[in-house]
Curated annotation (Swiss-Prot):
Keyword Glycoprotein assigned: yes
SMART domains referenced in this protein's UniProt entry, alphabetically: IG, IGc2
Carbohydrate-modified residues: N611, N637
TM spans (from-to): 713-733
Residues of the signal peptide: 1-28
Membrane topology per record: Single-pass membrane protein
Any one GO cellular component localisation term in the record: membrane
Ig-like domain segment(s): 32-140, 150-234, 242-324, 399-498, 500-592
Protein name as catalogued: V-set and immunoglobulin domain-containing protein 10-like 2
Keyword annotations: Disulfide bond, Glycoprotein, Immunoglobulin domain, Membrane, Repeat, Signal, Transmembrane, Transmembrane helix
Compartments, record wording: Membrane
InterPro entries documented for this protein: FN3_dom, FN3_sf, Ig-like_dom, Ig-like_dom_sf, Ig-like_fold, Ig_sub, Ig_sub2, IgSF_CEA-related
Length: 776
């Protein structure tokens, strides 16, 4: 008996010997590709470029599997792959079949090639009943080839109507049988139409103009179906006999007629491909080329015979048609309708002068027919109870007109109410009162009133009045009164003239030297609209071009940005001024620029304050507050402290320092700071102040959670224990007080500035073991 000695090693000599026993023939020698008598190879199909899996169904798990391949037309059996379960090997020559791999005992071929078409033999080594057996499985693999994209070929892409045309659907490759279908799409047609089945050739005999358009063919086999690009068949034909149309359309016994001074359009159309070339004649004289001839203003001299000649230049053929045009002269244009506004009544006017005879006109309204007259007619109509959107029509009739001609007037109530606004003009010397109430028909009438006294004349849809600017206009109220026939009296709007009022964001701003300062003010009210501006400490107007200053207008707000604050140039009182034609108002903002001095005496005249160090910085109230404690050292006078914060630890990406507290008394040594975001890590520093002189900033620290206190636990144990436990606990606290660094602390070490003269010493940690025994 022959067996495998190991399942987790590469193929060894014993396995190779077994396969030599399995292999009926040597590699490269002829070997019968069919099974024994009565057996047939299993048929398997695969698609080129896809994957196929050849299964070797052998029953029990085999000890080894060998796959071989015999191409069609060959008797040479070629090894493909071998596996023992624990290891496998694929022959390099298997690349001709595709990307070959083994999945258990199955042979998987990806990116299948046509060279894989042929017979496959699966030989397996089995152990059954203590004996080694071999099994064989024959498979026949058929590789199917998808059809390639077809292409339509026309023997004549531009035939003349009446000849024979053949279209061929050419396919480069594809497994037969192939199925063909033809589709036709006319340029102005609704869509594709099936015109042929099964044949690769489509014959159009004889071809006519209905065959013009795009032709596509579809080819399919068992694998796929593809459609060709369209091929255009351009059928040459025509021209047919031209058809002449006249607009506006009017028929007479001898042809067409049109009204004098109307625009008359004569159009000619003759079916032809390529399109016809058109030439117009009047009484045998050429007057125009092109399919359309337009008489911009017809007169009686345009009466005559008009001929359209259509010419196909490709075939050099032509046809023609002649019609007669007669010009009549009714009244010019059409009736003209107008409406005049009066209180409670509308006066409707309709006129249509000229023509022979005069046109007959009559009005018709929502409640019936109105008056009639010749040439012009007037109708005064009471608007009481008249709905919005009422339509009045004036009908004009003339013997030369087949249909009456209308003009219409629709009465519309203007929406809403009048709208008032005011602007200043000519250097604030005048104030312009403006009032508007659009959208009405007839237009609304508007007028300005001052204490019920009319100002100026009535205006239609809009009223404007100029006032000379003067201070006594402040507080005065002006009314714009509107009226319309369809609305109830009393529609108005009012304006109150006011001197501007403003407010500042902060009346006092303090920044350190070299930092940015922001001063803000907002306009609260003012009519006419006011202009905001900033004045510097020397009462000079600050503009966008002023060095060191940037203005940020935001609607009714104007913010002033002071860059690189300098106490010598930027300290002082700034004014935000609001100005309109009635006057102005202002608010002051004091900007303090605090100096950081490097020596004992600052250039500003105040001695340098002492240095400050942060001794404790802990969180409070779920990290929404911090408790800050500090100490001072070194000589110097002080008048207070300044605390700064920023939303990150010090780094190149850290934000600018912001003032967290500045009104701290000189005797204070702690401060609680609130308004923090629990999700943000803050950094803090503190400076001592001597009037406007700032000392060195302290080291930068970030807050930590408060350390755990052992007092409650110890006292509880002492209360329930013996005196010995109490004495031992007191010894623990005494030792901790003398050696604070021997106990762990949750506060992280802070970074001290390199300029800080004081460096903290850190003792080496001491391990202490304390045992407390309490007896209840």
């Amino acid at each position: 008996m022959v067996g495998l000695s190991a399942h987790h090693r590469p193929l060894g000599c014993r396995l190779l010997i077994l396969f030599c026993l399995l292999h009926p023939g040597a590699s490269g020698q002829p070997y019968p590709t069919s099974n024994t008598a009565g057996e047939e190879a299993l048929s398997v199909q695969g698609v080129r470029g896809s994957s196929v899996e050849l299964e070797c169904r052998t029953g029990p798990a085999p000890m080894a599997v060998l796959w071989s391949f015999t191409p069609l037309g060959s008797l040479v059996l070629q090894p493909v792959a071998v596996t023992s379960g624990a290891s496998s090997k694929v022959e390099s020559g298997a690349l001709a079949l595709g990307v070959v791999s083994l999945r258990n005992s199955s042979l998987v071929i990806e990116e299948l090639r046509e060279g894989a078409r042929g017979h496959f033999l699966c030989q397996t080594l089995l152990v059954s009943g203590g004996q080694v057996h071999t099994a064989y499985l024959y498979l026949m693999l058929t590789v199917l080839v998808p059809v390639s994209k077809p292409r339509v070929q026309l023997n004549d892409p531009s035939p003349v109507e009446g000849v024979s045309v053949v279209a061929t659907c050419a396919v480069r490759e594809g497994t037969e049988p192939l199925t063909f279908s033809w589709h036709h799409h006319m340029p102005q047609g609704p869509g594709e139409v099936l015109v042929g089945l099964s044949e690769p050739r489509l014959q159009l005999d004889p071809v006519n103009r209905t065959h013009l358009g795009w032709y596509t063919c579809s080819v399919s086999n068992v694998v796929n179906q593809l459609k060709s690009d369209g091929a255009f068949l351009d059928v040459i034909y025509g021209p047919d006999k031209p058809v002449i149309t006249v607009e506006p359309l009017g028929f007479s016994e001898d042809g067409f007629w049109a009204s004098e001074r109307e625009e008359v359009t004569l159009s000619c159309l003759a079916a032809s491909n390529p399109p016809s070339h058109y030439v117009w004649f009047r009484d045998d004289s050429q007057i125009h080329t092109g399919p359309t001839y337009i008489i911009a203003s017809a007169s009686r001299t345009h009466t005559g015979l008009y001929t359209c000649l259509a010419h196909n230049r490709h075939l050099d053929t032509h046809t023609q048609t002649t019609v007669q045009l007669i010009i009549y002269y009714p009244p010019e244009g059409q009736p003209s309708c107008a409406v005049l506004p009066t209180l409670g009544v509308v006066t409707l006017l309709c006129t249509w002068p000229g023509g022979f005879p005069n046109a007959q006109l009559h009005w018709e309204g929502p409640q019936g027919i109105g008056p009639s007259a010749s040439g012009n007619v007037t109708w005064s109509y009471t608007t009481t109870g008249l709905p919005n959107g009422s339509i009045f029509s004036c009908t004009g009739q003339h013997p030369t007109l087949a249909m009456p001609i209308f003009c219409r007037v629709t009465l519309w109530e203007p929406p809403g109410s009048p709208t008032c606004w005011t602007t200043a003009t000519v250097g604030d010397q005048y104030i312009m009162l403006s009032c508007e109430w659009p959208g009405g028909e007839p237009p609304a009438m508007l007028s300005w009133l001052d204490r019920q006294q009319s100002l100026g004349d009535l205006g239609s849809s809009q009223a404007v009045h100029l006032l000379q600017a003067q201070s006594d206009l402040a507080g005065r109220e002006f009314t714009c009164q509107g009226s319309h026939p369809l609305t109830a009296p009393g529609s108005h709007c009012r304006l109150r003239l006011e001197v501007p009022q403003l407010t500042v964001a902060e009346p006092r701003v303090s920044v350190l030297e070299g930092e940015e300062a922001w001063l803000g003010c907002a306009l609260q009210r003012g009519t006419p609209p006011a202009q905001l501006l900033w004045l510097g400490p020397q009462q000079q107007q600050l503009e966008g071009s002023t060095p060191g200053f940037i203005l940020h207008p935001e609607g009714t707000h104007l913010r002033l940005q002071v860059r690189d604050a300098d106490p010598a140039h930027h300290r002082g009182t700034y004014q935000c001024v609001a100005r309109n034609a009635l006057g102005n108002s202002s608010q002051s903002v004091l900007l303090e620029v605090l100096s950081e001095c490097k020596g004992f005496v600052c250039p500003c005249g105040y001695p340098t304050p002492p240095n400050v160090t942060i001794s404790r910085l802990t969180y409070r109230r779920q990290r929404r507050e911090v408790q800050l404690q500090w100490a001072i050292y070194g000589p110097g006078n002080l008048t207070g402290f300044l605390v700064q914060q920023r939303a990150s630890v010090p780094s190149s990406e850290a934000g600018a320092w912001e003032v967290a507290a500045s009104d701290i008394e000189p005797e204070s040594r702690d401060r609680r700071l609130g308004g923090l975001d629990p999700g943000v890590l803050y950094a803090f520093r503190i400076l001592a102040m001597n009037h406007h002189t700032a000392g060195y900033p302290s080291e930068v620290k970030t807050p930590v959670d408060p350390a755990f206190s052992a007092y409650p636990a110890v006292l509880g144990a002492a209360g329930t224990g013996v005196v010995v436990a109490l004495a031992t606990s007191l010894l623990v606290f005494q030792y901790a007080a003398r050696h604070p660094h021997t106990f762990p602390c949750t506060e992280t070490a802070s970074t001290t500035s390199s300029s800080d003269p004081i460096q903290e010493s850190i003792d080496a940690p001491v391990n202490v073991t304390i045992t407390v025994t309490a007896t209840p």
